[in-house]
Design a protein with these regions (language model features):
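Short loop segments and helix-boundary regions at transmembrane helix junctions
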Residues: 33-39, 78-134, 169-171, 227-247, ...
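Transmembrane helix-bundle core of multi-pass membrane transporters
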Residues: 105-169, 271-276, 302
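Helix-loop-helix "hairpin" substructures at the membrane interface of multi-pass membrane proteins
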Residues: 144-223, 246-251
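Single transmembrane alpha-helix segments in multi-pass membrane proteins
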Residues: 11-61, 66-68, 72-98, 240-245
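Hydrophobic core segments of alpha-helical transmembrane domains in multi-pass membrane transport
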Residues: 26-27, 51-55, 105-109, 153-164, ...
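Inter-helical junctions in multi-pass inner-membrane proteins, predominant
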Residues: 8-13, 167, 204-237, 270-274, ...
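Loop-to-transmembrane alpha-helix initiation sites
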Residues: 94-95, 121-125, 148-154, 197, ...
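Cytosolic-side transmembrane-helix boundaries in multi-pass membrane proteins
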Residues: 162-163, 181-195, 263-302
Length: 302
């Protein structure tokens, strides 16, 4: 393998797609919360819940569709708990979100042993996984990337511009942004901030669950303890540094997925694992700092 193929090849592009899809779904859910003025640190738990729910339901039913539906429902259930506690009961969202992350990690580990009688990883050869409609295409360069797209990947591609259109060009979207910018002013105009924030958290729950389903049933068909592996915290950091700007969010996630894909391949030529593991975070941080500075110069930063 040449040095160029390690950093730029169809295989790298396919790996980027596989890594980017769950990040995008989870990131869009987090963005909805952020624009509604909700600091959602439970994204890690939402994704992990989706991972387990998808595999458990797929194993029980033999259907990936049922697995995806269960993942979305499980994510929505965790988000409902967060919304009920932080919005209805006025609990600290940071404390409650962190507690939910810990609870989900412990619960999925317990259920893995209780339901499947295994520790660490559950994997079965006949476990239904998501279809890949473009598998087998012979297109040069982009062929492997298209083959890596599942239906949830196509959903992620469509969801990003759809969310932009909703937030910028619809009345409910503008009201949601108004709630995030100044809830008191929004309430004076007859908008109910709690209702929009509750809905934003539920949307994040569904998208987080779908992100987990993509992670566990997309390119693989398995569940392992703590499968989300910090991706939710990566999204939280990216959202904080991107200032709620969708282009900056997507660019940062793309850089993260690319650096992660290249890092894995560079391990095969002797790059220390610690360096390859750190590369996605360092690259993403550099991009966010650069875009943040540019935005401030242009007066676009919030």
């Amino acid at each position: 393998v040449s040095h160029l193929e390690l950093v730029c090849s169809p295989a790298v592009l396919a790996a980027v797609v596989r890594g980017l899809v769950p990040l995008t779904l989870l990131g869009l859910g987090g963005l909805v919360c952020q624009r509604a003025g909700v600091f959602n640190v439970a994204l890690e738990g939402l994704m992990l819940t989706g991972c387990f729910g998808a595999v458990a339901a797929s194993a029980w039913s033999g259907s990936a569709v049922v697995g995806v539906a269960a993942a979305a429902a499980a994510g929505a259930l965790v988000a409902f708990a967060l919304a009920a506690g932080s919005i209805r009961r006025r609990a600290d969202p940071l404390v409650l979100g962190t507690a939910l992350n810990i609870a989900v990690a412990g619960t999925t580990t317990f259920l893995l042993q209780a339901l499947f009688h295994v520790r660490g990883t559950y994997q079965r050869p006949d476990l239904a996984r998501l279809p890949h409609w473009f598998a087998g295409n012979t297109l040069p360069w982009i062929g492997p990337a298209l083959a890596a797209l599942s239906p949830l990947g196509l959903l992620a591609v469509a969801a990003a511009p759809a969310l932009h259109g909703f937030l910028e060009h619809t009345v409910p979207g503008m009201r949601l942004r108004g709630v995030g910018a100044d809830p008191t002013a929004a309430a004076s105009l007859g908008v109910r901030p709690d209702r929009y924030r509750f809905a934003a958290l539920l949307v994040a729950g569904v998208l987080g669950g779908l992100a987990g389903a993509e992670l566990s049933l997309g390119s693989v068909a398995l569940f392992t303890e703590n499968m989300s592996a910090g991706r939710g915290w990566v999204i939280v950091l990216v959202l904080l540094l991107s200032g709620g700007r969708l282009p900056a969010l997507l660019l940062a996630l793309l850089v993260y997925a690319y650096a992660q894909a290249v890092g894995f391949r560079l391990q095969t030529v002797g790059l220390p694992m610690q360096l390859s593991d750190a590369a996605p975070y360092l690259a993403t941080l550099a991009v966010l700092i650069h875009t943040g500075l540019r935005a401030r110069r242009r007066g676009l930063a919030p």
